[in-house]
Amino acid sequence: VQPSDRDEAVEGAEEAAEEVRQRLAAEAGDVEAMSVLGAMLLRRGDLDGAEPQLRAATAAGDRAAANNLGVLLHQRGYADEAAGWWRIAAVAGSAAAAHALGRHHRERGDEPAAEYWLRQSAEQGHALGAYALADLLEHRGDAAAGRWMRAAAERGHREAAYRLARALDRQAADEGDDGADNGVAQAAEAEQWYRQAAARGHQRAALYLGAILEKRGELKEAGRWYLTSAKDGEARAACALGFLLRDAGDTESAAVWWLRAAQDGDGNAANALGALHAERGETQTAERWYRAAMDAGDVNGAYNLGLLCAEQGRTAQAEQWYRRAAYAGHREAANALAILLLQVGDATGAEPWFSKAAEAGSVDAAFNLGILFAGRGEEAVALRWYERAAAAGHTEAALQVGIARLRDGDEPEAERHLRCAAGGGSPEAAYRLATVLDARRPPAPAHELGESVHLTKSECEEWYERAASQGHRRAQVRVGMLAAARGDVVEAARWYREAAEAGSRNGAFNLGLLLAREGSEPEAAVWWTRAG
């Protein structure tokens, strides 16, 4: 016999012995024993055995028996008779009966009576009564609901703890930048209540707690709570656990949890499975999961189907799926649809979709609108869209704003945008920023080739080098010229050669000059010929 089986056997024997003791006492006329025995039989589901014991105890004035008799009658479908016994017990001071009576009245639409009895229960410290009162008050928008929800949570009601946490989360989000602490206090308290509810087995609280911990970088604990919630049947937690595992490099385990979540109707997990199979080249399986995501109400499924069809050259089907997602409000699908329409020459049809996507917050669509208007020669309108995209962090848009500001003579504003674009990785922006800074420098003293000169690199040189290292040919030529000016023949030759081999005529010509000065005239001639 396993220890757990032995423990259960011992517990069962103790319960049986206790029942015998209570039955003997009840048969001897002990009212409390009648009440306790009736409650034991009621919990076991023996309604026929429980009813005479509870009726006898109730007749003798036992309020707990009256409450339990109400529960028994309610289970048998005699709701009105049950309410009568609950009223007797509630008037005698039973908080549990007051709660049951309050719920009875609410189910029948009598809210004033429901509130009266639920308040009686809550004010006696009954957790279920406090929660039911809070729910009633919240339903009609009464601000007092929060007080009773908190009271129920403090008395151990897990759903109350969860709902209190959700309310605090909403307060933290609403407070945002307007509050003294940006909602930090509410968010911290919300986490505490999520933790309490999750510890009591609330699966959604465990999900939200996991999300908070993941956002904070506490991935191990986040994973534990996601796992707890997922095992209890929360599909969103299974999906989130899958993403954690994928990010940790365990794609196979991630797929197991995504499959579990997707089979339970989670569209996000179905999309993740679709993407996984698409990466493996299993397009038919990917398409099946994207369709499952769409059927689950996740509009990303239609968007991903569009992407899949576009990659396979199925343009008509791609357009169909993009349209479906775009009409459902998917901004990136609207942008993708506009690009597809542009590619087939329908600029008129593309513009409204770019606009719709941009207005919905698509940064790429705002940039694409800039390109569209610039192509029509509407520079002022194009600049407005570029500025909008640049303000949201779009690197190429920031470059275009920088170029426009340079053209307008607004060098400080141009420099600001070029710095943003260059910092975002644009080699063209790095080169143009370097030229702006270069123009401000006083001319450096000339040096003979081969003469070693040690100077601290200026900021403009650093930007030239960054652009050059990213393959920008004009930057490579300029870095070569700066190296030559310092007398560093080897470095100059390296950069000229890189530019020349990438097709730069200036790079080829300068490399030829350098080689000729070094006495390598035959090779110099080759590069001059290439320079044309």
Set out the residue ranges of the language-model regions.
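Residue-level detector of the short coil/turn that links helix A to helix B
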Residues: 45, 77, 109, 140-141, ...
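TPR/TPR-like (Sel1-like) alpha-helical repeat modules
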Residues: 121-124, 154, 327, 391, ...
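Conserved alpha-helical positions within TPR/SEL1-like repeat arrays
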Residues: 32-39, 64-71, 96-103, 128-135, ...
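Short helix-capping/linker turns of helical repeat alpha-solenoids
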Residues: 29-30, 60-62, 92-94, 124-126, ...
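Solenoidal tandem-repeat scaffolds enriched in leucines and small polar residues
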Residues: 112-173, 183, 187-215, 219-225, ...
